[in-house]
């Protein structure tokens, strides 16, 4: 039996941040928890799936293996049973607020770094070909002066308020849950000689320069995840991730819609009448387009596979060129005389013979007038 996608189980995208995954899990776990659905086998199965998905996607190492190899990369790592490792609602609150056991203590002492976001503006050409960009971001990194301890002497004293747990147990109505210790801010220890460089935080803000590979075909709003390039974790915990959001600059010629490109192509009055070849710019060079005689404004020519590459396959979009017939301007007296002779040569049956759109329009006007005055 084919296993369900963990991302689909939690109703999140594959680029979802840790915060988004946690929020989605909490909502679903509260909805399908067996304590809320006694005797409901389907809810119990759903809760097991949700718990299994969260255990994998909330762990950076397991999530990375899952993204690379699918279920095969994590099946041997995940042993699930019962209700996915949760007893009652208190266990769910422990997951998000910390617990009174050694497990909660470990979480309070080791905290994963925060995820960061960066907006990167690129050109349509860069999105077409793909590009490597260099960016500089501010992020929190471990303090070199105190090796991340926050202490000059690199020594720590157990917090007297929480006794090293990092959390203090609270009772609210029927629920008992843990809150971060306000004395030590969840670290489980206190510092008597704070480091002069980081003021006891163990972290300092630094500028980090990174190279980001932008794949060809990337679109507005796409996010690229750089694992481990977010803020530094505390006490040996993993770093957060960096999410680079792509913004594509407006182009002077082309408009993008999904994987297709669109443009308006001005042609001369004579070229529209007589036809001929014209050079059309594309993102990867000029191409020659054959304009058929008697081409009208609004006609669209499709250039196959001259659009953007699809990120989700090997398809490439098309370039659609809309014709705009330009009316001549700044005419000399001689040119105007020639045009008048040309107009006279068309004769009285000009509309019926030489202007099909004009004929249709006037016919519609006449029909409308008849109905209006009848």
UniProtKB/Swiss-Prot annotation:
Positions that bind Zn(2+) 2: 159, 162, 181, 184
Protein name, entry field: Chaperone protein DnaJ
CXXCXGXG motif repeat positions: 143-150, 159-166, 181-188, 195-202
Keywords: Chaperone, Cytoplasm, DNA replication, Metal-binding, Repeat, Stress response, Zinc, Zinc-finger
Gene3D superfamilies for this protein: DnaJ domain, Heat shock protein DnaJ, cysteine-rich domain, Urease metallochaperone UreE, N-terminal domain
Zinc finger (CR-type): 130-207
Domain J: 5-70
Cofactor: Zn(2+)
PROSITE patterns: DNAJ_1, DNAJ_2, ZF_CR
An example Gene Ontology CC term for this record: cytoplasm
Family of this protein: Belongs to the DnaJ family.
TM spans (from-to): none
Presence of keyword Zinc-finger: yes
Organism of provenance: Francisella tularensis subsp. tularensis (strain SCHU S4 / Schu 4)
Assembly description: Homodimer.
Signal peptide per UniProt: none
UniProt subcellular location: Cytoplasm
MF (Gene Ontology): ATP binding; heat shock protein binding; unfolded protein binding; zinc ion binding
GO biological process, one term: DNA replication
Residues that, per the record, bind Zn(2+) 1: 143, 146, 195, 198
Cofactor remark: Binds 2 Zn(2+) ions per monomer.
Swiss-Prot/TrEMBL domain comment: The J domain is necessary and sufficient to stimulate DnaK ATPase activity. Zinc center 1 plays an important role in the autonomous, DnaK-independent chaperone activity of DnaJ. Zinc center 2 is essential for interaction with DnaK and for DnaJ activity.
Gene: dnaJ
